[in-house]
Structure formats: structure tokens, C-alpha cells
Amino acid sequence: MRIASISTGFIEVPKEITLNIYAQGCKLRCEGCHNAQIRDFDGGEELSVEAMAKLLNAYPMVTCVCWLGGDATYQPEELCKFNTLFKKMNLSVALYTGRVFSDVYDLLKDVDLVIDGEWKGIPVTDATSNQKVYKRYAELWKNISWEELKEEGPR
């Protein structure tokens, strides 16, 4: 999978210690994009599932993996393979995508949390944002507020 960068964080997913993976490439051209420099699908570096497993073993405190971008949904086969690994490692999986939930639904088998919608300058933490938060409850998905997510966490 083409990856632009990887970092750790505590903000992107409430109540989790997160390994943030910035997927390389995005077809959307959101005005004010935070990461316009990683839109090109040919940039970044190729990372295998095996290499990711080794990397995660070096971060034993991580409880969640969060896909940011770029947009990982434009690498669907690789995204699903990585997410299967993350679930086997008992990690939560969060996905930020500029696409809408219904368009990426088939990619969500091993995902716990989705933040969807193009960036329009208002963060998902603001109730007036166009972006939506979807949380998995067993086999059902529910659209919740950021405040609810802060209370409940992604699991």
C-alpha cells in the first residue's frame, strides 16, 4: 500500500492511543485540504502488511489505527488487507474519508469508526460540520455526534 507518512496521536480518535497512517493519493480536491501535498498516487512509499505488523509490534501502547489522507479508500484491496491485520491484533480501526459512507460501505468489514465527507473548512468536532461520524455497534452502524464519540470511544 502507498503510504505518505505514519505518526502517533491522541486527538483523531477519542479515548485511543492511535497510530495514524496517512494514505498516499486522493482523487478529491477539497478546498483548504490539510494534506494537498499527498494527493499524487505515485508519491509516498510502498508498505507491506508484514512490514506494518513489525512496525505495530514496536508500538505496544497503540490501541487504534486511524487512516487519514490522502484517502485510503482509493487503495481498496490493500486497505482491507491491512484492516484484517489490525483486527487480528485486537486494534480499533478508524477511517477518515472524503467520500460518503454509502460509497465505501463494502470496505468496512474490519472498521469500527468512519468519519466521512469532504473537507469544507469546518472540523468534524463542530456540530455544523458537513462531515459525519459513524460508529459500528456489532453489525449495525449508527451516525453519532463527535460529543457522543468522546463519551463512548470507538469500541
Predicted regions mapped to residue ranges:
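N-terminal [4Fe-4S]-dependent radical SAM core
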Residues: M1-Y22, N35-F41, P154-R155
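Cofactor-binding loop segments of dinucleotide-utilizing enzymes, especially the Rossmann-like FAD-
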Residues: Q24, G70, G98
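Classical nucleotidyltransferase
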Residues: L108-R155
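Short, basic/glycine-rich phosphate-binding loops at helix/coil junctions
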Residues: C30-I38, P60-T63
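Flexible loop residues that form catalytic
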Residues: I38, G70, E118-W119
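Canonical radical SAM enzyme core domain
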Residues: D40-A53, T73-L113
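Short pre-active-site segment immediately N-terminal to redox-active cysteine/selenocysteine motifs
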Residues: Y22-R29
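Conserved glycine-rich "GG(E/T)P / GGGxP" loop and the immediately following alpha-helix
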Residues: V62-K81, L85, Q131, Y137
